């Protein structure tokens, strides 16, 4: 009943600005061609790589875009976000989505992807945008001769210099990740939509790591994310989500094999920098015994908690939500895992139960566990639950992340799920983890802050 975040390669290695590559559409509505394209290989591992592409508009505003390039060494795009990709052999075309097609003068649009390679992974030699070959400059034309004026030529009004974009600083002790889908959507938006999406983009949220990439790539993601948080003097939040038999084959089904899990966790743990909060395996205990293929799930959780804690993590074992299991069940299962290498448990991950209900439920569990601490995911619980768990409509953003020290056992309110990322292909939503702007705006609009 939980969903993963879209996997994305985030390391700032091998970044390549492709010769100031520029182009823009030549249609009458989108004239004055000129832009910059930055193609950055952000991470690379045997057989795979991640990349980010940023388009900066140096000409007139455009309402949609299509970027074309050709791979010459057999590279292939496997998963792309913030755009739609089509390929024909080595030829690649990426088109804008309904919500990020508009680029004002001086504005940017970006997308990212994971790809495959073999032998070599050279940067594409050229790009074209909306049919115009990238040249690196705004094309010039011969000016039409100006007749001699009979009146003094007025002094033209100076064009103001665009104000550089500044990454806002987070307002709490938790880290705001500027690489999330919500953050990129906010950057691309304008008007009322931008004001609403700011509520999501500038609120600290967890980074999900799972087996949608191999273990070494997942380790690199963790190292990059936690490293950026530590450099900013903030606390990172991670979700580890790769347990065998994950989600019992539902919308977020998957996980690594039983024989691979310990090695996968150890590899990922090697990437930890600082002391991140880690939510360990959403739904794993709540679904214990519900399907085959789980192996020694309690043993896996014990091992993962130890491996992560020894590398500096503060581990909270996920225990479901307030309307799922009676108090006795999570108490029994959490006791089986134990707390030698965990500071507490987590509730309401990716769910919609109110903070009040979740806190009352957590306190009952905590009392039975000798006062163990707990955290609550409040990312989407502002209107509580309507009984649905997969993309219910009419929900709202919940309380913003904050550390708690009120003597109740509650350690923190966190945004574990990333609002705007789909729960799965249900109720009109895209696949799990994909950005869904419509529901992001709805939850932001319904928020009580």
From Swiss-Prot:
SUPFAM superfamilies: Carbohydrate-binding domain (SSF49384), Glycosyl hydrolases family 6, cellulases (SSF51989). Residues 32-137 form the CBM2 domain. Residues 132-141 have a biased composition (Low complexity). Disulfide bonds join 35-134, 248-291, 390-426. The keyword GTP-binding does not apply. Residues 438-449 are annotated as: Catalytic. Residues 142-167 have a biased composition (Pro residues). Pfam families: CBM_2 (PF00553), Glyco_hydro_6 (PF01341). Residues 1-31 form the signal peptide. The linker region (also termed 'hinge') may be a potential site for proteolysis. The active site is at residues 247, 283, 423. GO terms for molecular function: cellulase activity; polysaccharide binding. This is Endoglucanase A. It comes from Cellulomonas fimi. The lineage of its organism: Bacteria, Bacillati, Actinomycetota, Actinomycetes, Micrococcales. The gene is cenA.
